[in-house]
A protein has these predicted regions:
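Glycine- and other small-residue-rich loops at beta-strand/loop junctions that grip anionic moieties
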Residues: 83, 151, 155, 184-188, ...
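Active-site/ligand-binding-proximal alpha/beta "capping" segment
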Residues: 163, 168-205
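His/Asp/Glu-rich mid-to-C-terminal helical/loop segments that flank catalytic regions of hydrolases
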Residues: 236-250
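Metabolite-binding pocket within alpha/beta catalytic cores that recognizes anionic/polar moieties
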Residues: 1-154
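A C-terminal functional module that forms or caps the active site or interfaces directly
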Residues: 193-237
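Short acidic/His/Gly/Ser-rich catalytic and metal-binding motifs that mark active-site loops
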Residues: 134-136, 234-239
Length: 250
């Protein structure tokens, strides 16, 4: 894996001028946020050595290098999912490459189903913690000591410092924010009513099919992480809302 990381980062290095310490992953239906980035380079995933190519509608498949809010950033416009058939190492490979390029802080976003009965469609949820329900762990296999420890701690997977800053910004701008636990499942089928109820019982506030593997790998490399979910469908009513992918993208 190290050779692949080096090959990919070597290809991208000429596009990364100066210090880019912030990485961003734009999830399903959130690719349009890429328009807020002052783009210097937009590199298709298919052009980057060893990168997978997203097969999901709503994921454009470009690595954006530029500035956002006065900060130099590297942003993924579209991510990879375990349900697409990729291994966990392939799903999380771009995070490894970001780290090799100097990224120290990772911002992840996703579209999620609201499990908490107080959540409404359109709510923004700061991820304070996650529940890993994927069948494969991204760190399974021989550990690469150059990247991180064999048994990384997850006591603070999501930075309390960044969560506090986000809450302060939300209060200042009068943007209501939820804060909760994200449950990550394999997919691609959406959850049954019984599964939603079970996730609620074990402490989940929102559910989706991404984010958790990327954050685990980022923390393995001691990157500071912040996560945000957009609640695109709700299970607050007794009758489960019929969910489809087009709805989740909207």
């Amino acid at each position: 894996m190290l050779d692949k990381i080096r090959e990919s980062s070597k290809y991208l290095a000429p596009f990364v001028k100066g210090e880019h310490t912030i990485g961003i992953i734009l999830g399903t239906g959130l690719g349009e946020l890429g328009k807020s980035i002052e783009i210097e380079h937009a590199i298709p995933y298919m052009a980057i050595p060893n990168f997978p190519v997203s097969t999901v509608q709503g994921h454009r498949g470009e690595l954006l290098i530029g500035s956002f809010g006065g900060k130099k950033v590297i942003a993924m416009q579209g991510r990879f999912h375990y349900y697409e058939g990729y291994s966990m190492k392939e799903v999380t490979f771009p995070v490894r490459v970001m780290h090799a390029l100097g990224v120290k802080t990772l911002f992840v976003s996703n579209a999620a189903g609201g499990v908490n009965t107080n959540y409404l469609v359109g709510d923004l949820m700061i991820i304070r913690d996650h529940i890993n329900l994927f069948p494969e762990h991204p760190l399974r296999g021989k550990n690469i000591d150059e990247l991180g420890p064999r048994f990384p701690g997850m006591a603070e997977a999501y930075s309390k410092r960044l969560i506090q800053l986000a809450e302060e910004a939300g209060n200042k701008l009068n943007i209501p924010l939820q804060k909760g636990v994200y449950a990550g499942l394999q997919g691609p089928s959406f959850e049954t009513p019984a599964e939603y109820n079970w996730i609620r019982v074990i402490g989940g506030d929102a559910v989706g099919m991404s984010t958790v593997p990327e954050v685990i790998v980022a923390r393995h490399m001691n990157m500071e992480c912040f996560g945000m979910s957009v609640i695109t469908n709700s299970t607050a009513s007794e009758e489960l809302i019929k969910t489809n992918h087009a709805e989740v993208q909207d």
